[in-house]
Swiss-Prot record:
Disordered: annotated segments: 210-280, 292-311, 329-584, 645-685, 755-844, 851-870, 879-920, 946-1061, 1112-1244, 1288-1355, 1367-1567, 1662-1839
Record's compositionally biased regions (Gly residues): 365-377, 540-555, 670-681
Sites bearing N6-acetyllysine, chain numbering: K1214
Keyword Nucleus listed: yes
Top-rank lineage group of the source organism: Eukaryota
PANTHER family per the UniProt record, alphabetical: GLUTAMINE AND SERINE-RICH PROTEIN 1-RELATED, PROLINE-RICH PROTEIN 12
Biased composition regions of type Polar residues, renumbered to the chain: 490-501, 520-534, 1769-1779
Protein name: Proline-rich protein 12
Cited InterPro entries: DNA_MethProtect_Complex, DUF4211
GO cellular component: neuron projection; nucleus; postsynaptic density
Any Pfam family the entry gives: DUF4211
Species per Swiss-Prot/TrEMBL record: Mus musculus
MF (Gene Ontology): DNA binding
Subcellular location: Nucleus; Postsynaptic density; Synapse, Synaptosome
Amino acid sequence: MDRNYPSAGFGDPLGAGAGWSYERSAKASLVYGSSRTSHPETDILHRQAYAAPHPLQSYATNHHPAGLSGLFDTGLHHAGSAGPDASVMNLISALESRGPQPGPSASSLLSQFRSPSWQTAMHTPGPTELFISGALPGSSTFPSSSALSAYQHPASFGSRPFPVPSSLSLQDPPFSPPANGLLSPHDVLHLKPSQAPTVPSSLGFERLAGGGVLGPAGLGPAQTPPYRPGPPDPPPPPRHLPTQFNLLASSSAATAAEPSSPQLYNFSGAAPGPPPERALPRQDTVIKHYQRPASAQPPPPPPPAHSLQHYLSCGGSYPSMGHRASLACSPLGGGEPSPGAGEPSKGGPSGATAGAAGRATGPETAGGGAAGGGGGYRPIIQSPGYKTSKGGYGPATGGATRPPPPRSTATPKCQSLGGPAAAYAAGKASGAGGAGSQAYSPGQPQGLLGPQAYGQGFGGGQAQDLSKGPSYSGGPPQPPSGPPPPGLATCQSYSPDQLQGQLYGVQSEPYPGPAAHSQGLPTASPSLSYSTGHSPALSGHGGGWGPSSLGGGGEASPSHIIRPLQSPPATGRPPGVGSPGAPGKYLSSVLASAPFLAPPGASSYAAGAGGYKGKGDGSELLAGPGGSAAERTEDEEFLIQHLLQAPSPPRTSGADGLVGEDGPADAAKGLGGSGGAGGAPGTPYELAKEDPQRYHLQSVIRTSASLDEGATAALELGLGRMKDKKKGPERGGETPEGLATSVVHYGAGAKELGAFLQKSPPPPPPSAQATQPAPHGLLLEAGGPDLPMVLPPPPPQLLPSVLSHAPSPSPSAPKVGVHLLEPATRDGAPQPPPPPPPPMPLQLEAHLRGHGLEPTAPSPRLRPEESLEPPGAMQELLGALEPLPSGPGDPGVGPPNSEGKDPAGAYRSPSPQGTKAPRFVPLTSICFPDSLLQDEERSFFPTMEEMFGGGAADDYGKAGQTEDDGDPKTGAGPPPGPTAYDPYGPYCGGRASGTGPETPGLGLDHNKPPELPSTVNAEPLGLIQSGPHQSAPPPPPPPPPPPPVSEPKGGLTSPIFCSTKPKKLLKTSSFHLLRRRDPPFQTPKKLYAQEYEFEADEDKADVPADIRLNPRRLPDLVSSCRSRPALSPLGDIDFCPPNPGPDGPRRRGRKPTKAKRDGPPRPRGRPRIRPLEGPAMAGPASITTDGAKKPRGRGRGRGRKAEEMGGTRLEPLKPLKIKLSVPKAGEGLGAPSNDVISGVDHNSLDSNLTREKIEAKIKEVEEKQPEMKSGFMASFLDFLKSGKRHPPLYQAGLTPPLSPPKSVPASVPTRGLQPPPPTVPTVPHPAPSGPFGLGGALEAAESEGLGLGCPSPCKRLDEELKRNLETLPSFSSDEEDSVAKNRDLQESISSAISALDDPPLTGPKDTSTPEEPPLDTGPTASGPPPLPSLPSSNSSGTPEPPLLEEKPPPTPPPAPTPQPAPPPPPPPPPVPALPSPTPLVTPVASSPPPPPPPPPPPPALPSPPPPPPPAPTTVPPVAPPEEPPAPSPEDPEPPDARPLHLAKKQETAAVCGETDEEAGESGGEGIFRERDEFVIRAEDIPSLKLALQTGREPPPIWRVQKALLQKFTPEIKDGQRQFCATSNYLGYFGDAKNRYQRLYVKFLENVNKKDYVRVCARKPWHRPPLPVRRSGQTKGPTPVGGNSAPPSKVQAPPPKPETPEKMTSEKPPEPAPEPAVPEPPAPEKPSPPRPVEKEKEKEKEKEKEKERVTRPLRSERATSGRQMRTDRSLATGQSTTSRLPKARPSKVKAEPPPKKRKKWLKEAVGNASAGDGPGGSSSDSESSPGAPSEDERAVPGRLLKTRAMREMYRSYVEMLVSTALDPDMIQALEDTHDELYLPPMRKIDGLLNEHKKKVLKRLSLSPALQDALHTFPQLQVEQTGEGSPEEGAVRLRPAGEPYNRKTLSKLKRSVVRAQEFKVELEKSGYYTLYHSLHHYKYHTFLRCRDQTLAIEGGAEDLGQEEVVQQCMRNQPWLEQLFDSFSDLLAQAQAHSRCG
């Protein structure tokens, strides 16, 4: 590690002067540090390593780096039990001595994680601090270790890759957070702005960045792993990163290149998103770390503001860069430049970091900007990197394509990065964005230099300059000059320029606090600028600054500039360049900010940067991204969103961007909001000052944008917009809006989306609050300010500004100044307890005040806010705490703020400071949910989070929720809880999406993040707890009591917390523990890792979990986003309200929120639900949110929670589909998170608390829901357990899902059950309870499972698995229908679980696949929010995901649909089922272990997202299935495990009257039996389709048996969705017949006297049933044609057993690629099982097929061809597997597979396609030339040279080669009705026969001649001599050895030698052609035999398979054969035409 620290140099340069500067920041960091303290030893070691390094060292050393380390390390890595105290002490001392200590903190943090890298980064005291502060939480996030290490190494030890790899790899990953530093940027930003902000920044940023970058994309998963397992971290990270960062990837590339090893590694390790989650905290730390370096360089001059800023900037940048280039950055920066360079490098990393940066970009951008400012990091990092990284921006560079634009802005920075010139150019370029990105990338490496130069120039100037046109112009020059002074100079240069120029225009505001530093140009600039810069951080930075500077114009400029940067993407680069232009767009933002133009400038700027940025920048960033956002939205949406969102800072940007994207107006608003949110980071700092307004605006926009951003974005947008509108009404509202936006912003981060959504919900509440516009505004503003406050200075300003919006800015500024300190302090408070004293009080007060009071300074404005906030204040406080969760939604802040500051608090919540919270909030807001929250959580329990994965976004949502819970998470669990609750309200909304679950998740998240944030988060909690928390929280965490203490501490929030507490507390507690007790933290981390592990098979879990997180998150996010808008708000609201109701006091804070939220959110929620199909969900969702929150803690389990949460959950479920993830996440995340945290933490500490709470909750639930009796609960618990078990099984399949599945199972069942309740929304409580219960149960179960596994996750998991397996059956023991019903219920639940699990699969798979997030993103963006998410998830994921999609689509709709009606009744039945689940949940909730399970839930979350729909589906089925349990029990475990959750997707279902009656083959295996009439409830049709599309559990279908309907329940087999006959019957007479609609199904098989069918995608052909397929050749051909169709059909959805294939087939048309991806795996797996079932199935099918063989051959053919092609493409994708499945389909005959089938399957290369083609021919078409001719006629020419034909031919040749080796091959194929080779063979034979018949028409063959031609394979043609009597005649002499046409073996009997035949010369060609066609197969066989002989002769002992494979690898030979075949057919066609 130390070597990482080579950073001595790094530290030295940075550390020396800057380090100290940053110390202030460091102090903030300290808070984190305190956490880290836990690892003093480690820390110290590292630190020592550092120590030499220097100031940083000293400061690192003494600072609580240990604390940080402890926090992180301990929490994350180590179990420094002592840590907590040390942490606290450190925190305090660090806070007190903030200056020096922070460094160590960071260092410590770094040390812990990657001490070296961390420390390196941390060396710079300031940055350290920042890092610490941010990093801690953030560090966990993702860049953390890798990035940190990586870039740190690179930078500092630029070339010290070892550290990178090593540290990075191990430490860094753990340190991912630092790596996250890159995420941290935002955090950094925040941090940077103020010390206090630092933390929040960090946190926020981390969240943002981590979450955003990583978080959003892969944060959850990515982070978590890193978090948990450092190493795993990397894996996920990549995935995440890539997603998250494309930038990362890109960055990685760039960065990697840059820092190269480090960077790369970074990518791997740090970049990997996982780190973000886990590393978020680290990230923060990293940020700090990074920052520190930056700080060192530039900070020295303006340490305070700058420090932060620089820190931010550096840090941000650094993180960004730091991520990858952190080292580089830092190292580079050794001096500023280095950092700049490094940063750039880092920027590259930034890419990775970008996310960080991106977020950071908010921060980083801000940070980067700041970094840029701060060092040139910013640019590097950020923007480009960031952006790039960010996705939002990073993407620009890299993966974010879209993001790039935003990134562009970042990029510009990056570009700047590229060079100062570039910087400006970049800045300018913003368009350059791309360039920037590039620049960045290039810059990155080059950036090292350039970056620094640019960094400098760019950073400061760049961002500013660039960002701002003004400074820009000046900037460029400046930058150049700056570059010279790289770090400082640049920083200063432009800093000043910026500062002054625009930077400072805005900066001035920041001035107040940061101004000075700001002034300290570099610092100020960075700081402010940075803030702004943040904004600028890319654009915002520039823009922000520009804007800032631009002030009015500038302001706008900043905004727009940001926008330009960002905007450019969004607005257009031009704006980027052209601030003004941007401004236009941005302006609104800015404008919005305008009021706070100046402040906004600053704020805006900061905000812009953060808020601004968020707003302007953010907006821009975001907006850029906004614009970009829009673009980004889709692409970025996830990436960017993730990145962006992750980069909430950018987030802000994202939000902003989102916002921007959202719309300038929105942007304006959003921007403002975003800015606020986004700005949060900036805002907190500068933004805070004024951005709040702007921020709010941005926030709003953010929300909108967010919404926009995500697929959900739109929803969210709507939501956000709604919010906006609601909020919009008043800017104040705006603030809320901002919050909302912010919230939305989260949404924007797909990942964050969840959070986002969740956040969103908060916004809605804020909207509601908007009603309290003024207050809101104030609140929001306050929130913003709070957020900003996070950056104390700005916050105050912001707050005032926010508060006053326009009016207060001034005060704000001053306040800011004050605040800076205070907030800083506050930040510090959280971060640096010492300052906290004031801050503490402040915090307390602020927190109390709702954060509105943020700091005393802010108080005044807070006061206004306070006024609003007061209630809110409490809330705020709580909110701050809770807001943490809320924070997740900056919106939380905003909304919370709106709510009452809750949001601020919430945001703040992330904040470790009440005020800070707000500040943080913004950060959080910006990055909070994802980054922060998630990061935090991630930091804390990245694993958990990851597990929650769903979590990332969900986490975010959860984070938001968690924030509610997060409050708990916050460490001030209780307070936060409560606050969170309120914020939760808003957050709830946020939570709503992830809501219930999320809450825990959030909590967890928070907890995780709270590590740092915990400090921060806890802070909010603590804040309420306030300073104490700050101090105390850390202490509390150490002891279990502390969490409780927290609760008490939360005193005021306590109630809320109380209710939330159990879960929350766990979270909080856990969080606190983690945070406070570093060791616990570490332990938790470890635990978490373990938990995670156990949850997801440790490593696998890690990665998968990570992935899962991501997928989950994505889906969740998507869901969140999609659902979020409604759900979040609604959920939040509902959640809140219900929760409050149920939770009552506990939810108290929330309650208010709830009230507010209830109203508006619900509507919103409803819509969301509506889309998601969760009308009830809306209510329930809300409920769920609340419930989630509460249940989240234990909540899900809570019956009451169940109700509330259930509702929410339900809602989420329904909407969740995608959103499911969120709720799941919320549930899973929340509960799991909480649990995990608690599990981890909770193990020690929370366990009791949680348990008590849970028990209490259970009691409550039971009281509330008598239905949920213990027995039932127990039953359900068992069931859930079993369900979980399923997941475990599943997990086996998907490691990650394992745990998550566990949770998923719980969730799913819960969910499945839940949905009905949601349906019952009408019956809110019961229904919600049910749903919640279900969800809760699920979660609970998961929780329990996890919880149980908490201590030893793995063991637990295993036990759970076993238990589940054992219990599964008993699950319904309670139910009346014990067998049937139980089974049904189990089945439903299993299905739900399966669906959930599947998603986790998806998640894990996704996790495994970096693309997953992107995929998700795409899907998310794309159409069905749920579906896409799911599909995307699935798609990206694996077959399972697709499965999920397939199953879910139908399910969700039906579930919801049926549910509405059935649910009410079902609730009772479900009572057994649902209630049971609920009780289960409750028990689960009640049991502390559940908290651990929650971690699984997070994984589940991803799963859950899909599952929810399935759940709904399940629910309907549950309702019905409840009764019929057959299928479930049967495959619930295994089948469900894998496919349970998601089956292969199917585009649609053939419902009579609804589907086109085209004679299109329905595809898929199975036989259509006209005699079997199946129907489905009319109301279930939408659910069915949705479920099939998503792979979720569909509603049941019924077979008409005269006057009875036999129920067929859905299940998954081999990934395919099928329906199994049950013994449940309903009457079908009278009016019942009107309620059902005919459905077309294909009969698959009959096993154990049970029929299995699958729903057709299209109406099957109705061919006259041919009695039997004739084997007659003639007939055969027809059958061939006909059969072909069936095979085609089969093919389309290959064999059911091969669900994947089937899915593929079915889906291929639409999602062929997707299926292809997933399919292969599934088929492989299913393939073995398939045979048996399939054999029977095949037999049946065979008969059926025979019946239908007569179908129109032609259409069939055509279809077949078409499908074949699709299949083929799939096949290609799936390769053998695919083929296999395809062949299987050919199995349409339903014959048992041949014994060799497996081998063949493996060998089958083109079988699938071949099967496709020939699938139909029943008999050897060879012999018969008749029937198929028609069909074949159509096919030949068309298929001749198609890929399908080639594949078919390949399969044909493979079969012939096999036959050459094994003479009995063909016979065996025939006997077994092989579907792999027979279809292709028959198709080819059919073609030949068809052509032969055509040729025959031209000939008049005598029987003798024909017989001779047929008998002899050779034909000699002799022309008669001229002059001979027969001139003109030709002699045909048949020759050769007769052979058996069927087996191709020589006949043993002797044949009379053929005679000569004379034919006309003209006709001789026809004879030879006829002969060639007839014997083509044999001739080819002979060639194959020659080939095999040649191969066998050349090699020794080659097995048949090897020989076959070698032949098939001989491409030229195959081509030659195919060409000869094509020529032959072409010749035949030509001859047949002429004639």
